């Protein structure tokens, strides 16, 4: 389905940006209400990463920001791009499918077994990142069981002419060129960003090339806006394959698949608008996303060349009613989501490899509402919401053959309460129900007879926590538990996915910040996660009480910032990831993956409008891997080794 943007744009301009007056604009933020507003409260227990924190950190990609500053668990991306697989609350290999990534409130997580295209988001275009752990299904639907990550880009509305250009060179023939431009007047703003990245990466046959461009044109004032945004990226990556246990000792950097590659091109266009009419705010988002990917694999059993085309159109109207009765502030959000997703896969094969001629469609229609109440006198915040969603999935596979279709009617709800306790302390509790729909890769069938499409995954979520905010210091603690039925999981013996018996995810999350002196600041995070099978069997093995693979029980991070001089700053990040089960070890018969600690540093110095920086990743040259898979007899494993010590130099000019 294609939407003609021209008449729609005219309608939005008339509705949202008519009769604009020249005014001084408030700071615009985006919150989990799916509205932009002036200084609206953050969601209960949300973590916010600001643009200044990103600029001062040792992170150079969005994935590194989420891992180093946000405490989000990530693993190596097999194709060598910065699109790190993410996992918020212990889902292991399916962490990506349970963590929803948004840009300006619009979904960019894929309906396939691929990571969200984080590499297409320029760091210098980000205003802030909101990480909300726990279910986000009420507002966003499927795939948000463990939480949402909302990346909010800068608005150029009212911004003076400004920009930046930067160059970074480093190990493995790294070349990274970036540029950004902003200009605006009282009622308009334009932002443009571009990047060109080239690197050979650590492994043989692992070169990665990335070109991105994005921008936004916005018209509006404090009572409304209309914005037309676009992003496009072109990725070309070589695929080295995994290393065996013996090869990790003898040839870590070698390639098992010297001919394999993955190329991908995608575009995203969106038209967004809001208009405030007294106590009501009307909003409408229309977005279109397309992707074309080519992937070649060559093995001893044959080769495959897969060509896939994906397209998704979304429409999201909503209304926010903000009013006050006595000392109670009400924020009632009512909205609808409609999306239409299409997929085509044409795979040619030789030898014993399987060819594939596959297509699929998914149509989602949802209605949701959420009411946020703030009782100012007692310092109490209450959030209550629900969602009803209808999903129609169809999947056609010509070679098996298979024609499958399913309809699902799904519900989600959430109740959250936060209470101010005085002296900077607050406590909160949250309970909710979420769901996830299996994507087309998870529903794929390789050999007849094919089963029906997988059942939706459902989760009952509970969380309690406390926060303290003082002068120059803060601390937070939370405990969560998720009881999941029909968790969607890969089953290696049949090369397919199944619905697991009941699982439980529970954990403790701690975070703290301290301004030690005027020039020294510390931030620390610790997470203990336990993901286990509550009952049932897997491949004929009783797995009751066993650990879910690829979920480290202990993770910790420490960020140190030292303003050595007014123009010189040192940033240090230390990340610890504890032991975890190898992929494919649901019976827990093999030893655990080794724990690892990685230290990254960045020294930055400002000279006028210039910033020069030296960065070193994996400072102590640790040998480690973040992904490994055990063989079928539980006697050995394969893994993807991570980069050892590497460095870069960068120069940035701002005007």
Language-model region placement:
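Transmembrane beta-barrel wall of Gram-negative outer-membrane proteins
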Residues: 162, 169-198, 203-240, 260-278, ...
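C-terminal beta-signal and adjacent terminal beta-strands/loops
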Residues: 576-585, 604-655
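Face-selective signature of the C-terminal outer-membrane beta-barrel domain
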Residues: 220, 224-233, 262-404, 409, ...
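Short acidic/polar hinge/loop motifs at secondary-structure boundaries
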Residues: 106-133, 453
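Membrane-embedded beta-barrel scaffold of Gram-negative outer-membrane proteins
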Residues: 282-297, 340-342, 420, 426-432, ...
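N-terminal periplasmic accessory domains that precede
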Residues: 62-65, 84-89, 99-102, 116-122, ...
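Gram-negative outer-membrane beta-barrel transporters
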Residues: 319-321, 326, 330, 376, ...
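Extracytoplasmic beta-strand/coil segments of soluble accessory domains associated
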Residues: 63, 67-106, 110
